[in-house]
Amino acid sequence: MSHSNHCETRASSTNLALLCLTYLLYFGQLGVLVPYLGIFLDGRGYSSEQIGELFAIITLARIVGPSLWATIADKSGKTLGVLQLGCVLTVISFATIFWQNTFWGLALSFGMMMMFWTAVLPQLEVITMQSVKSAGSNYGTIRLWGSIGFILLTVSVGQALDFFTTDVPIYASMITLTALMISTLFLSQPDKLNASEEQRGDFFKVVKHPAFVIFIISATLLQVSFGTYYGFFTLYLRDLGYSGQQTGLLIALGVVAEVVIFIYAQKLLNRYSVGSLLAVCGVLTALRWYALGGWGSSDIVVIGSQLLHAFSFGLTHAASVHFIHHHLPAHFHSRGQAIYIGIAFGLGGASGNYVSGQIWQQGLNAYEAFTFSAVMALLSALVFAIFSYKKWHSK
């Protein structure tokens, strides 16, 4: 092996290691903010209605953000630059939270943070796919570190909440975001990729295809169903007597189940249609929410509901990525992903957060809130059940 080839191999290995670290920190941050933001806001004295409204405002930023950043990355070809800029602006906007003492001040800070935060993952995925292809590596071995980071931070912050104030999630997030920003500064720039004007012009024709529209409607309904879980699950467990450590372990259990299903997802996708799998995932998600609301005091039910995260999120995510990859032309993957994130997670997530916040009533209507989520998940499944055989063209 020549000296130049040896250096290239070493640089490639270093970049893959940095990508592992970046995934660990990115999803580690999600492991702090997603489960424990409600705890932080409750500690600040906000009502369940206000918590739901703030979650909705934050989530709305995901409607505009992904498409904006995807367009900038597509047109400039500077994927890494967009990723790094997103991380820097995320840290700056998140830091303002420490000086905010009002509802709208926090809403502005969190909303700006989420707007910049949406620049990170889509670009990270592009860089990773290009890097593993050139290095002959495997995407799964890199992405696995994201799940590890989520588990580590979720459990650690859960334990810390047993001993410290409800501001712990904010301090942990600030440290994690800063470390993430630093890690991205050492990543390598991928090759510039540009789509032609003709390719860009075909995009809206592609996304108006009935199969894509059905996919977006169902995905949006499913994300509406997650509103109660994302906004109030940790508060629900606290009210049921679970400690912070136990809550962290239960959330981590869901991520472990998610990792396991990722291992078998491709075999399932090869055997069954995407529509059929997503319909089954919708039914199981409805069962998860209804059981959690009706029998949340049972340890077995709570553990079982977390294991169903393998289908609610894991298989659903794998099937959704598979659909976008196979239904859309390669030069539309980034923007297709942006549409999916923006509408399903942005509009759907915000709607679910707001409605569940209005229903929750400091936990008095927990059953009603989870029942609402179960109905939304069933509607998601129904959309696919109706159209799966007639109009679904992807496996």
Which residues does each predicted region cover?
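Hydrophobic core of transmembrane alpha-helices in multi-pass small-molecule transporters
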Residues: 24, 93, 103-121, 220, ...
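Helix-to-loop junctions at the C-terminal end of transmembrane segments
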Residues: 65-78, 161-162, 261-273, 360-361
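Juxtamembrane intracellular "pre-TM" segments in multi-pass secondary transporters
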Residues: 3-13, 187-219
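Cytoplasmic helix-loop-helix junction between adjacent transmembrane helices
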Residues: 111-145
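Multi-pass alpha-helical transporter architecture, strongest
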Residues: 97-98, 179-191, 371-395
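Structural signature of the two symmetry-related core transmembrane helices
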Residues: 81-95, 276-291
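A membrane-interface helix-boundary motif in multi-pass transporters
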Residues: 159-175, 357-377
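Helix-loop boundary and gating motifs at the non-cytosolic
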Residues: 9-59, 212-219, 223-240, 244-250
